[in-house]
Structures are given as structure tokens and as C-alpha cells.
């Protein structure tokens, strides 16, 4: 094993001198992988890697980046930040570098005479734009809810990184219907702590179970806050300082000045797309609930103030479809998901009642007599007789057969004399070896 360099030894000594909270803060700030924290030496070597130093410097503001060139005249706050990031060590006798001076060569090109750009607040969004932004956010909430419902009701294998397999994606598209970007929704739900894994399959987390009891505005706040917690520190600091700043050249100029090692053009482009998907910004202007997020205020309340009104229910038609004329409240979506099949997702969905959907409801514990009542609760018009007849017919046929398990044997009790004969003569059931043990009873 090669001996560590003098620089590595000095950094190891410094690491050993700081306390545990400081060490934990350093590891988090410099984004050190757990695998590199097995010893002070492995940690020091990772802190001294050129890539880690380069990425860490990118996140430091101008004032901190200028401090290493003249530490004696730097602000105490900047020196503390550099020491917390393991770039400088401060002692009563002065300051010393914890990394090679050559690793900080990018700082020599900084212009310490550059002028800070003027901040001009963005214009207020119109009522229509606020409503459109809220609709975008609510669409995301509904789509994530639909994804969680699908994962709760079926098994979807995942790959090594917790991503859905190609087969799972295909199954989810078939389950959810048109209008969903499964990959994007999966990432958002995972980032929010709603999706995890159980072995080789996707699974809901404890937080996902709590999600079901939240209002749509509280759900939105959770998604927005989770996303914002993962954005680069330079963006978080900029918007916290100026919550009303537009995401156009104004933001780019401010980032370029305050974080001179960041390339804002490429970085902000992808972040802007995410922010638009979440309804954080509308036409590059921050929404009121985005500003509430950056000011530490009530995001859910600000979002609810601009959210579109819920439709009173759905319109049922003779062809077994149920159409919404606007966003549906969570309780209406829950009822419809329990007894119908969703044909079109999104903010204004379309459902269809089928024999399979009614049978699934009965198997999930919905009583036969409650199906018509549930339909009346969510429909704004009279429930067509065809829907009631379908529910009654499926319930009647489902109740024609009872299955009971007794140790190693299974008993089938039929309520129609002819059903017993049908089951015995069914070629697909020959493998069960059904035997008649009574007028309406079979055993296998």
C-alpha cells in the first residue's frame, strides 16, 4: 500500500480534529458517498479528488470563492464556509489550504470588480395564468395518485436502480390508460418518498399510505417541497433571496454573477422544464405558491387559492361510460376507481363500468347492494338502468359460487343446480379433479 501524500496526511489530521456533527455536515455538503467514508484516509482521498473539488466549488457563491485568494481580508462568514467545506483551515496563527493550491486555479480567473446585476421583480401573473399553473400542478397530483393506486393493486418488477422494467412500464400503461408519462411520474413519486421497493418489485412507502388521507393541495405541497429539496444549492439560495425573480435572463444573470463557476444556461434549462411540470412557474414567472415555498410560507394554502373548482361528479351514459366535466375530488376518484375501469387519466378523466370492474370490486369487499348506491353518489344525473342491471347481473353470478378451504381440500358450493354440472364438465377444470359430494357441492 502506498503511503499518503503530505496533503492527504494534513487533511486526515484535520478531519480527526473536528467533531461528529461537523464531519456529518462536511460529508453531506461535499456529497461524499457512504463507500468513501470507511476511514479518514478514504474520506480524505475523496475530498481531494479533482472531480469532487470542481463540483463543490461550483456551488459556492462569489464571496466565498474570492476568499481563498486573500483569506486575511475575507469576511469571517466566507472563511467559515470554506473551512466547513474542507478547503481552508483556520488557526490562531492564520489560514492554511487543505487542498492543493493548484486545485483552486479556477478561482484565479474570477473578476472581483464585476458589478452585481439589478434585481427587477417579475410581473404578477394574471388570474388566468394562475389558474392554468394550478391546473398543471393538480394534474400532476392526480397522475401520481393514479400511479400509486396501480402499484398498490398489482406487482410491478423493478430493475437494479429501482426503475420499472420494460414489462412493468407496458403493464402500467395498460393499467393507467392514455395520458401518463410513467417514467417521469415514477421519478417524482420516488423523490417524494412515496415509492420504494420490496425485494424486486415496487412497493408503497409508509408516507404513501399517509398521502391517501391528504387533500389535493397538501399532496401538491409535498411534491413541490420534495422536488425543491433536491435542486442545486445555487438555485435554492437565489430564489430564497429573490422569490419574485423571473426564470429568464434575469435569473441567468444573477446566477452567473453570484455563482461564477456555474453554467446557468444549461442548468436552468432542465430545471425550468421540471418547474413548469410542477406548476412552480408559468411563462417563466413564479406562481404565488412557488413564492410561498421560497419564503417558507403555507404552500398548500397558496395553491388551493388558485386551484380549479371540483366538478360535482360525473355523467353516466347508457354505454357504461362515466364522464367528468372538470377535476374530480379525491373521494369521487376513490369511489370510481373502486367500481369502474379508468379509460382516460389526467385532470378530467373518463371511466367505464365493466363486468370485470364490478367483479373486482366485489372481490375487494364491496357489497353487491352498495354498488348502485356508490354510483348514485358520484353521478350528477340518474344512473342508467343498464348500469344497475350490469351490477346486479355480475353480483348474482358471483354469488352463485362459494369457495371454502378445509386443510388440503377445497369445497365449492353452488346456488344453481346446473352450475355444478357445468363445472364438472368444463375441460379447463379437469385438472382439479372435481367430485360431487352433494346436490350443490363439489370437492377437490
PLM segments and residue spans:
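Extended alpha-helical interface modules used as scaffolds for assembling large macromolecular complexes
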Residues: 224-444
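Short, amphipathic alpha-helical interface elements at domain boundaries
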Residues: 1-261
Amino acid at each position: 500500500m502506498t503511503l499518503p501524500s503530505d496533503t492527504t496526511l494534513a487533511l486526515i489530521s484535520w478531519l480527526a480534529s473536528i467533531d461528529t456533527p461537523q464531519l456529518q455536515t462536511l460529508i453531506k455538503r461535499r456529497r461524499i458517498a457512504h463507500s468513501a467514508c470507511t476511514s479518514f484516509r478514504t474520506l480524505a482521498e475523496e475530498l481531494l479528488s479533482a472531480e469532487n473539488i470542481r463540483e463543490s466549488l461550483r456551488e459556492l457563491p462569489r464571496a466565498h470563492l474570492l476568499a481563498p485568494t486573500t483569506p486575511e481580508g475575507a469576511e469571517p462568514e466566507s472563511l467559515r464556509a470554506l473551512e466547513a467545506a474542507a478547503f481552508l483551515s483556520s488557526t490562531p496563527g492564520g489560514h492554511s489550504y487543505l487542498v492543493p493550491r493548484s486545485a483552486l486555479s479556477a478561482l484565479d480567473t474570477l473578476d472581483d470588480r464585476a458589478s452585481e446585476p439589478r434585481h427587477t421583480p417579475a410581473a404578477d401573473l394574471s388570474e388566468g395564468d394562475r389558474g392554468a399553473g394550478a391546473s398543471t400542478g393538480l394534474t400532476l397530483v392526480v397522475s401520481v395518485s393514479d400511479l400509486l393506486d396501480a402499484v398498490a393493486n398489482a406487482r410491478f418488477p423493478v430493475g437494479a436502480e429501482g426503475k420499472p422494467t420494460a414489462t412493468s412500464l407496458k403493464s402500467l400503461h395498460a393499467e393507467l390508460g392514455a395520458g401518463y408519462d410513467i417514467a417521469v411520474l415514477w421519478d417524482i413519486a420516488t423523490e417524494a418518498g412515496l415509492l420504494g421497493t420490496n425485494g424486486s418489485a415496487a412497493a408503497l412507502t409508509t408516507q404513501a399510505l399517509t398521502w391517501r388521507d391528504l387533500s389535493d393541495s397538501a399532496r401538491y405541497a409535498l411534491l413541490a417541497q420534495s422536488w425543491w429539496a433536491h435542486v442545486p444549492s445555487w438555485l435554492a439560495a437565489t430564489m430564497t433571496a429573490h422569490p419574485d425573480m423571473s426564470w429568464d435572463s434575469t435569473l441567468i444573470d444573477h446566477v452567473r454573477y453570484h455563482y461564477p463557476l456555474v453554467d446557468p444556461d444549461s442548468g436552468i434549462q432542465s430545471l425550468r422544464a421540471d418547474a413548469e411540470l410542477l406548476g412552480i412557474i408559468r411563462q417563466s414567472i413564479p406562481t404565488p405558491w412557488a413564492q410561498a415555498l421560497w419564503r417558507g410560507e403555507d404552500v398548500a394554502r397558496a395553491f388551493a387559492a388558485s386551484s380549479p373548482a371540483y366538478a360535482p361528479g360525473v355523467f353516466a351514459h347508457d354505454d357504461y361510460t362515466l364522464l367528468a366535466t372538470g377535476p374530480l375530488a379525491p373521494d369521487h376518484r376513490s369511489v370510481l376507481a373502486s367500481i369502474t375501469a379508468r379509460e382516460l387519466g389526467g385532470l378530467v378523466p373518463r371511466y367505464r363500468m365493466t363486468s370485470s370492474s364490478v367483479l373486482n370490486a366485489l372481490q375487494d369487499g364491496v357489497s353487491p347492494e352498495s354498488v348502485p348506491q356508490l354510483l348514485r353518489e358520484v353521478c350528477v344525473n340518474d344512473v342508467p338502468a343498464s348500469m344497475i342491471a350490469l351490477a346486479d347481473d355480475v353480483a348474482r353470478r358471483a354469488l352463485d359460487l362459494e369457495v371454502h378451504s378445509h386443510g388440503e381440500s377445497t369445497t365449492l358450493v353452488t346456488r344453481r343446480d346446473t352450475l355444478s354440472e357445468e363445472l364438472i364438465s368444463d375441460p379447463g377444470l379437469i385438472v382439479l379433479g372435481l367430485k360431487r359430494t352433494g346436490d350443490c357441492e363439489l370437492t377437490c
